[in-house]
Amino acid sequence: MDIALAIKALILGIVEGLTEFLPISSTGHLILAGQLLDFNDEKGKIFEIVIQFGAILAVCWEFRHKIIDVIKGLPNDPRQQRFALNVIVATIPAITLALIFGKAIKAHLFNPIVVASAFIIGGLVILWAEWRERHRGQTHDPRGNALLEAAKAGAPRVETLDDLRLSDAFKVGLAQCFALIPGTSRSGSTIIGGLLFGLSRKVATEFSFFLAIPVIFGATVYELYKERALLSTDDLSIFGIGFVAAFISAFFCVRWLLRFIASHDFRGFAWYRIVFGVIVLVTAYTHLIAWQA
């Protein structure tokens, strides 16, 4: 086994696992890391598909009890049927656009400059969304400028996954479409979209996790079938290293994020995106790093 290649696979697997479910864009990080590590050829693209599969399996394991309950309840449990329908409805917009524009997006937008720009814009959107969340529960006293807390106005409308309506799911699905632009972040689009549409932070995050399952599973199966001619048993060890690294790092990342959102917002991720995006743009325009267009 090529040790240098194995180390690259390990690093990229960890990058995928740590960034797939945070609002910072795994695709954007993989594009940048792949170029820095010189691991962005055709085999590298197949490798990215494999490690995404490892990351999504970590979510399936973390939420295995809920997934089993949904499967068991599909024949006769209206609550589980409604949840499954919500996931399906939220998945349709992004899949539809990906099938129509996927090739054009990969041909023209999968480059560091677009990624960096999306990092910055996405960070600004997160800051605005968090500002909106903090001020949603405040209103002005008509007799003066004093602010009064309006608990009812500030409380999220959707506090549990069972409260999620079909229209809510569809709106989150529309928000997910922005994630087709590399650097935007699928989890960031769905979580922030959920917050803007009245979901609590916990519900928006959990629904984003569940929404990732059909999206990433579907993309993995489709891409592996399409690129099956490039698959080789010689690559199994390298793919295996990346797969396991992505699974383990994603598993711990998902658990950490679920604890984190209980007492924190996403402003830290927003500033990270902005700073990282600026660094990429500066290094590109000053030629400190020869990013490929």
UniProtKB/Swiss-Prot annotation:
Starting at the broadest rank, the lineage of the source organism is: Bacteria, Pseudomonadati, Pseudomonadota, Betaproteobacteria, Burkholderiales
Query: What subcellular compartments does it reside in?
Result: Cell inner membrane
| One BP term from GO | response to antibiotic
From the Swiss-Prot or TrEMBL record, what is one GO molecular function term? undecaprenyl-diphosphatase activity
Its top-level enzyme class, in one word, is hydrolase
Q: Pfam families in the record, alphabetically?
A: BacA
Disulphide bonds annotated for this chain are none
Q: Name the predominant localization.
A: membrane
Q: Name one GO cellular component term.
A: plasma membrane
InterPro entries xref list: UppP
Additional facts recorded: Bacitracin is thought to be involved in the inhibition of peptidoglycan synthesis by sequestering undecaprenyl diphosphate, thereby reducing the pool of lipid carrier available.
The protein in question is named Undecaprenyl-diphosphatase
